[in-house]
Amino acid sequence: MATDGTGVVTVYGSGTNGAALLEPSNHKSATFSVKVGLAQMLRGGVIMDVVTPEQARIAEEAGACAVMALERVPADIRAQGGVARMSDPGLIRDIKRAVTIPVMAKARIGHFVEAQILEAIGVDYVDESEVLTLADDAHHINKHNFRVPFVCGCRDLGEALRRIREGAAMIRTKGEAGTGNVVEAVRHVRSVMGDIRALRNMDDDEVFSYAKRIAAPYDLVMQTKQLGRLPVVQFAAGGVATPADAALMMQLGCDGVFVGSGIFKSGDPARRARAIVQAVTHYSDPKILAEVSSGLGEAMVGINLSDPKVERFAARSE
């Protein structure tokens, strides 16, 4: 993990190289730096999906750094099918009133009006999410048009840098939400980290052709090479169901973890939530991980992703 020596990730756009992201508008560049800084405040934390104010309070008491307000967790979206849209603003307001930690909410990819509504009701972060049904299969939201920070998913370095160019202040792996199966999240993290390791060994001439090959902006590719990491915080998401899963993602180099269906589809949600928070905090200590993993009851029932009938949410956009 590249830091400034104090354990803090370098904020993209805060230096002369970073200013290239949003040229020629210095105002936009400053605004983006603020949004990246807000996302960076969640580093080292766990963000939990909740569907009621009571679940939100359980998440806060367990030590979550933020909650994601939803009408249905991803496991229910998979099971029930149909069109998945932005949650009812009234529900989001109720969840906001119930907790003191930041509240996120999801908008459909490309649906900038849903994002406008979420910003208007005061959510702290918007997740432009492939878990919801696509609204636009050709365009993502121009996130620079908003004051609220955005979270976006990725499967590889090129996808991550394209979302950052659009204004994403936080990147998460897509994984396969609602499955309780961490294999795709691991694949996506390893892909991003492997691409960055390869990039660091390239000379500057090679970076031009590499940026074209992965369809990513050259300036962002070069900055990623210099930092040795993404220019924004990177969280793991999609299939994280146990404390061991969460610690695995942290050891692979993530800055934090999203946990969706894995908590409130388990046998003892409050205890599992506390255990996952502890696992993220102490991810490199196997003794603590063994202790917090004990006596949690049944984990959520997972889905075998080798089954070709399983819908792949992660493939919904690039």
UniProtKB/Swiss-Prot annotation:
<dbReference type="InterPro" id="IPR013785">
    <property type="entry name" value="Aldolase_TIM"/>
</dbReference>
<feature type="binding site">
    <location>
        <position position="239"/>
    </location>
    <ligand>
        <name>D-ribose 5-phosphate</name>
    </ligand>
</feature>
<dbReference type="InterPro" id="IPR011060">
    <property type="entry name" value="RibuloseP-bd_barrel"/>
</dbReference>
<dbReference type="InterPro" id="IPR033755">
    <property type="entry name" value="PdxS/SNZ_N"/>
</dbReference>
<dbReference type="GO" id="GO:0042823">
    <property type="term" value="P:pyridoxal phosphate biosynthetic process"/>
</dbReference>
<dbReference type="InterPro" id="IPR001852">
    <property type="entry name" value="PdxS/SNZ"/>
</dbReference>
<dbReference type="GO" id="GO:0006520">
    <property type="term" value="P:amino acid metabolic process"/>
</dbReference>
<dbReference type="Pfam" id="PF01680">
    <property type="entry name" value="SOR_SNZ"/>
</dbReference>
<keyword id="KW-0663">Pyridoxal phosphate</keyword>
<dbReference type="GO" id="GO:0036381">
    <property type="term" value="F:pyridoxal 5'-phosphate synthase (glutamine hydrolysing) activity"/>
</dbReference>
<feature type="binding site">
    <location>
        <position position="178"/>
    </location>
    <ligand>
        <name>D-ribose 5-phosphate</name>
    </ligand>
</feature>
<keyword id="KW-0456">Lyase</keyword>
<comment type="similarity">
    <text>Belongs to the PdxS/SNZ family.</text>
</comment>
<feature type="binding site">
    <location>
        <position position="190"/>
    </location>
    <ligand>
        <name>D-glyceraldehyde 3-phosphate</name>
    </ligand>
</feature>
<dbReference type="GO" id="GO:0016843">
    <property type="term" value="F:amine-lyase activity"/>
</dbReference>
<feature type="binding site">
    <location>
        <position position="49"/>
    </location>
    <ligand>
        <name>D-ribose 5-phosphate</name>
    </ligand>
</feature>
<comment type="function">
    <text>Catalyzes the formation of pyridoxal 5'-phosphate from ribose 5-phosphate (RBP), glyceraldehyde 3-phosphate (G3P) and ammonia. The ammonia is provided by PDX2. Can also use ribulose 5-phosphate and dihydroxyacetone phosphate as substrates, resulting from enzyme-catalyzed isomerization of RBP and G3P, respectively. Also plays an indirect role in resistance to singlet oxygen-generating photosensitizers.</text>
</comment>
<protein>
    <recommendedName>
        <fullName>Probable pyridoxal 5'-phosphate synthase subunit PDX1.1</fullName>
        <ecNumber>4.3.3.6</ecNumber>
    </recommendedName>
</protein>
<dbReference type="GO" id="GO:0008615">
    <property type="term" value="P:pyridoxine biosynthetic process"/>
</dbReference>
<comment type="pathway">
    <text>Cofactor biosynthesis; pyridoxal 5'-phosphate biosynthesis.</text>
</comment>
<keyword id="KW-0704">Schiff base</keyword>
<feature type="active site" description="Schiff-base intermediate with D-ribose 5-phosphate">
    <location>
        <position position="106"/>
    </location>
</feature>
<feature type="binding site">
    <location>
        <begin position="260"/>
        <end position="261"/>
    </location>
    <ligand>
        <name>D-ribose 5-phosphate</name>
    </ligand>
</feature>
